């Protein structure tokens, strides 16, 4: 395999690449997370199916890489499990709010069992996350996860408050990204560093988490339903103002005059957003955040830990390429 192809594979599958870099100890930790997630979710069918649907497990990976040289395995595993449970809970709740039929190629809990069951399933995963982390006996870690959970909820409320509002600024949008998405990346870094007695990586987590959300919003405009689990332009139809739309309204006078409540053909509007260059501009902004996060990694990191974090950042960027 050529060097370029190897680099591409590493960035597109950071879990596998970092597993090779971190050795058997890291692979054992990731396997322990999967085992514990299945144990916790076994009590309820919808919860278990949510966990079994899988995912990249980027947030647990961040916990482990942030605490890569830490002496203890069990506290790191519990922290990683707690973060992934919170993430899974938010996905279940998001599917209720979006009335999403698919998640990771499978029917959502909402589509299969309805709003009440999906809401209860998300609540269960949330509560089990805090129970898991409490076993570490660290008030500092519980505060970090609580702050992230509060931020997630605040971000959702800000998004609802801003619905259909064409005056949403880039600054307000980015703050919403930090609350709704990046706060959990930030918490993963803080929990890993706390359990592993490592350098503070919260700024790294916040930057790549914000980039992750921007790129996800780009994908809503450009991506097919087979990849996203929802129709193109779902954010438009929900009245959710994202960076591609904000930038497109500045570039295209027709989009600047668009009444969001009067959209008949979301696909056509998406095409106009793409044609304006707004999706590419939004993507470049996200990639700038990724590059900045890598450039600002603390000097005291070891070469293995630094490379692992760079791989995670590259994986976020390439996932949406």
Tell where the protein language model's regions lie, with residue ranges:
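Conserved N-terminal diphosphate/IPP-binding helix and adjacent helical/loop segment
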Residues: 1-88, 92-111, 159-167, 226-227, ...
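All-alpha helical catalytic cores of prenyl diphosphate-utilizing isoprenoid enzymes
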Residues: 52-56, 119-120, 134-225, 231
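Alpha-helical phosphate/pyrophosphate-handling elements in metalloenzyme active cores
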Residues: 44-88, 125-128, 170-208, 244-246, ...
